[in-house]
Amino acid sequence: MEEEQLLDYEEEQEEIQDKQPEVGGGDARKTKGTYASIHSSGFRDFLLKPEILRAIGDCGFEHPSEVQHECIPQAILGMDVVCQAKSGMGKTAVFVITTLQQLEPVDGEVSVVCMCHTRELAFQISKEYERFSKYLPGVKVAVFFGGMAIKKDEERLANDCPHIVVGTPGRMLALARSGKLKLDKVKYFVLDECDKMIGDADMRRDVQEIVKMTPQQKQVMMFSATLPKELRTVCKRFMQDPMEVYVDDEAKLTLHGLQQHYVKLKEAEKNRRLLNLLDALEFNQVVIFVKAVKRCEALHQLLTEQNFPSIAIHRQMAQEERLSRYQAFKDFQKRILVATDLFGRGMDIERVNIVFNYDMPEDSDSYLHRVARAGRFGTKGLAITFVSDENDAKTLNSVQDRFDISITELPEKIDVSTYIEGRTN
């Protein structure tokens, strides 16, 4: 793969030839079917290391979410876990806290491997590991993905071997095949957004090859917001008697506190309507999803010209540029982000309270992951979808049928208290 080429598995597949050279037992399966925003018990009840509790306190978290309450107590005992839960419900913290709690760092040994399907998500997960391990100075974290020079990764592994490695399957496999990344001491193996990796045949092959290089006795954990029944079966083949946690069944996988509306209009009317809505609505930060790179750039330019300063992120940017723009948006340097679907999964920006589907997503899965950028962790938010033709209408109907929800036409006036926390009209 050429270094400047920007691939992620959502858009196209990395080609292998271009790459350079304890298990818990018990039968504690659980299926949860109710939403609970927080539990009265706190993180202290999990008997975590004081250093981890201190970091959790710094993040402002007091009570575990439903998925954390269900997973963490069993996971910190070493049990394999397969978990489906709504976006924004704190799945990342489950495996980050769980692996840090159990980790006993040994110099020169990789103990934790965490893989996900996009580079941005890998970068974000590595930052979460750094955040929760800030009072564990002996713990070293590294992130490896394509689009960056592989030599730097090899030097890091040789000179300052991390205990925790986060990355995308393509780059991880290249490093493992070359012998630079040694996986024979791995104790904890995590797949985030596992449906993307297990559901994609090419990526699944990469994952399987990596798994074969790890010890048979290890803890395996897999997480996703969408996990069809047929994929659950495949996921469980990687595990030994896993605990299964499904927080809300698939038909009810809607986001608590998220208002969802559509606007029927012609293609040529989209820009004017978007500008009017940005004028009328109150927002902290907004993400606007489009279907193609050219549309992303054009809309970004239009918004800037109309005094709505924005940031654009798409797959044709250099990797450093993409990460830099992502961080700039996360740091609140601009309030509007225009993006293609590569930003649609797993990205966690706490201030986003409105998502626009300027272009209709391809399917109901993409819809869920896009609108989940608003209303993270059970907070309020607003999702507005533009419907401009018959195909758009069909997709919207399929979303409503699958998730058993009613997406209504956008009213002329919206009560600000329905989509911004702590506001009254």
UniProtKB/Swiss-Prot annotation:
Helicase C-terminal domain ranges (all copies): 257-418
Reactions the enzyme catalyzes: ATP + H2O = ADP + phosphate + H(+)
GO CC entries: nucleus; spliceosomal complex; transcription regulator complex
Xref: SMART domains: DEXDc, HELICc
Subcellular location: Nucleus
Helicase ATP-binding domain ranges (all copies): 72-245
Motif (Q motif): 41-69
Region (Disordered): 1-31
Sites where the protein binds ATP: A85, K86, S87, G88, M89, G90, K91, T92
EC number(s) on file: 3.6.4.13
Cross-referenced Pfam families: DEAD, Helicase_C
First-tier enzyme category under EC: hydrolase
Classification via InterPro entries: DEAD/DEAH_box_helicase_dom (IPR011545), Helicase_ATP-bd (IPR014001), Helicase_C-like (IPR001650), P-loop_NTPase (IPR027417), RNA_helicase_DEAD_Q_motif (IPR014014)
This protein's record includes keyword Hydrolase: yes
Motif (DECD box): 192-195
GO BP terms: determination of adult lifespan; mRNA export from nucleus; mRNA splicing, via spliceosome; nuclear mRNA surveillance; positive regulation of gene expression
Biased segments, Acidic residues type: 1-15
Keywords assigned by UniProt, alphabetized: ATP-binding, Helicase, Hydrolase, mRNA processing, mRNA splicing, Nucleotide-binding, Nucleus, RNA-binding, Spliceosome
UniProt note: phenotype after gene disruption: RNAi-mediated knockdown prevents germ cells from entering meiosis and results in the accumulation of unspliced mRNAs in the cytoplasm.
GO molecular function, one term: RNA helicase activity
The UniProt record lists the keyword RNA-binding: yes
Subunit comment: Interacts with rsr-1/SRm160.
Function per UniProt: Required for spliced RNA export out of the nucleus. May play a role in spliceosome assembly.
Record family assignment: Belongs to the DEAD box helicase family. DECD subfamily.
Protein name, entry field: Spliceosome RNA helicase DDX39B homolog
Taxonomic lineage: Eukaryota, Metazoa, Ecdysozoa, Nematoda, Chromadorea
